[in-house]
Amino acid sequence: MTWSTSFLSVHFFAFITTSIHAQLTGSVGPLTSVSDKAAVKTCNVLDYGARSDNTTDVGQPIIDAFADCGSGGLIYIPEGDYLLKNWISLENGSAWAIQLDGVLYRDSSPSSQSYMFEISGGRDFELFSSNATGAIQGSGYLYHRDDTYTGPRMLHISGVSDWSVHDLVLVDSPMFHFVIDGGYNGEVYNMAIRGADHGGLDGIDVYGDNMWIHDIMVTNKDECVTTKTNSHNFLIENIYCNSSGGCAIGSLGSGANVSNIVYRNVYTWDSNQMMMIKSNGGSGDVSNAVFENFIGHGNAYSLDLDSYWSSMDAIDGDGIYYHNITFQNWTGTAVDGETRPPIRVICPEDTPCTEIALVQIDLWVEEGGYDEYICKNAYGSGYCLDSATGTSTPYTTTTYVNSAPTGYEAPTMTDDLATAFGTSASIPIPTIPASFFPGVTPISAVAGSS
């Protein structure tokens, strides 16, 4: 254990040079443009029996339109309010798109845990709003007010390649908002996801290969944008966790397999953590990851790699091997750096972490008089990490810092929520913000913006 009145950051590590470039391996998104798809055929759901009266079911008209346009064409849902009675499951489409300019409202039935809107298989797909006001309203509060958090999930992309989802709003799902299983060459951007202040209402959960997720705002109290196992070559940037659970990798169990992941430009406000990598036992490998340019305010935890995460049951195995992972350029404040250390790197005793880099982590407390940093069985460079190599001797180092680091102060965002949304009343549909990270404009202009 050490005590210091100042803390010296290490600004350069030889082994981070290659890891910082880990991201995409090729092009992402649809193979053909929306205009080309529309030129083949356009299927307006109003021609298939839909009505913008929030009474007539729009689910079956969308399914019927897919029969005509799912092998080449555009399904068009005009502005207006539509009732979603029949859940939508569309499979193995090609060269097709859905333009959702209206708002879909979940009907009170069915009540199963299945997905309200599911796209599986196929390739060259796009789901978007041309005016950035297209939305799905899940009315999850009708479950949550009765303390029920098991129910329908909202949007699911499964086994699709060369695709995108953008300029949409997802609101108040009874359970998970957006799940991506086996997404390949996909792009997700310009979205606002807003859920209740409770666990189990994940924003985006994703696994796959060659994925670009950017310019996303999430409000809930669970996963913001979280990478699951079997994920490779991800670039996740310009993320706004606005009173959320925060971003994460995990939770990870047996046979974990995650590599070449970049999170950058992540802004986290009033959330559970800025970034958490979580496991408890298990096996496998997480490697070649970079977490850079993080800003946080009012969060419970900040930088948290926890291989003994107590919120999941322990899994058989010596632990996941975490290696070649860099955290750099973090600024802002934590609620209480004494009881919840802003730096926590807790690695398995039998499978120590190696090649970990902590670079310019400038975080300070909002309450209390000092920061606490804790590293356990973690080897690399910076802060409380042990620089030794070739050893597996268990260790724990706790460092106390009683003066604020230079440069910890960081900007806030105008859309920061003063209070979270509860669980007993309808959550209003938000506007997609003009920015998702301080001083940075969206990579692609939000639809309909001037």
From Swiss-Prot:
E.C. number: 3.2.1.-
Subcellular location(s) of the protein: Secreted
InterPro entries: Glyco_hydro_28, Pectin_lyas_fold, Pectin_lyase_fold/virulence
Disulfide bond entries: C43-C69, C224-C241, C347-C353, C375-C384
Keywords, in A-Z order: Carbohydrate metabolism, Cell wall biogenesis/degradation, Disulfide bond, Glycoprotein, Glycosidase, Hydrolase, Polysaccharide degradation, Secreted, Signal
Catalytic machinery residues: D222 (proton donor), H297
Magnesium in keyword set: no
Assigned GO CC terms: extracellular region
Pfam families (alphabetical): Glyco_hydro_28 (PF00295)
Domain of life where this protein originates: Eukaryota
Chief place of localization: secreted
Endpoints of the signal sequence: 1-22
DNA-binding among keywords: no
Gene3D superfamilies: Single-stranded right-handed beta-helix, Pectin lyase-like
GO terms (BP aspect): cell wall organization; polysaccharide catabolic process
Top-level EC class as recorded in UniProt: hydrolase
Biological role stated in the UniProt entry: Pectinolytic enzymes consist of four classes of enzymes: pectine lyase, polygalacturonase, pectin methylesterase and rhamnogalacturonase. Hydrolyzes alpha-D-galacturonopyranosyl-(1,2)-alpha-L-rhamnopyranosyl linkages in the backbone of the hairy regions of pectins.
Family under the similarity heading: Belongs to the glycosyl hydrolase 28 family.
Protein name as it appears in the record: Probable rhamnogalacturonase E
Organism: Aspergillus niger
